[in-house]
Amino acid sequence: MLKQVEIFTDGSCLGNPGPGGYGAILRYRGHEKTFSEGYTLTTNNRMELMAAIVALEALKEHCEVTLSTDSQYVRQGITQWIHNWKKRGWKTAEKKPVKNVDLWKRLDAALGQHQIKWVWVKGHAGHPENERCDELARAAAMNPTQEDSGYQAEA
């Protein structure tokens, strides 16, 4: 039987683009581990993706995961859009390169053999874990230490 793990994630950006951060909580049998990191120049969508990636990459074995995010971009991207992006060689329906493709590929790899249920929660609506992740993400964004090497400014 697979371990049942809960993951809660959020991303934040002070300006978009601007300094950003992510926050994630990984919970297993009442034990929690938190993750957060700040980046000097990034976007909110990249930080939402990073939160999910870092938490999933922390799992050491195959798990049954319930991952809660307030990002429709992440939830829809991974449950709906990614299949066609991959079929089209990481291009959109308009034949344009998928934005944040470096992180989408990393998230796709992080899914591994996990069984994942993606849950959308309304942000800033009093969901306790989402609020904690938001606090972690905003604190990280206010004290960025990393460079987001994959961020590409819009042309």
Swiss-Prot record:
The gene is rnhA. This is Ribonuclease H. Its main location: cytoplasm. It is found in: Cytoplasm. GO terms for biological process: DNA replication, removal of RNA primer. Endonuclease that specifically degrades the RNA of RNA-DNA hybrids. Mg(2+) 1 binds at residues 10, 48, 70. Binds 1 Mg(2+) ion per subunit. May bind a second metal ion at a regulatory site, or after substrate binding.
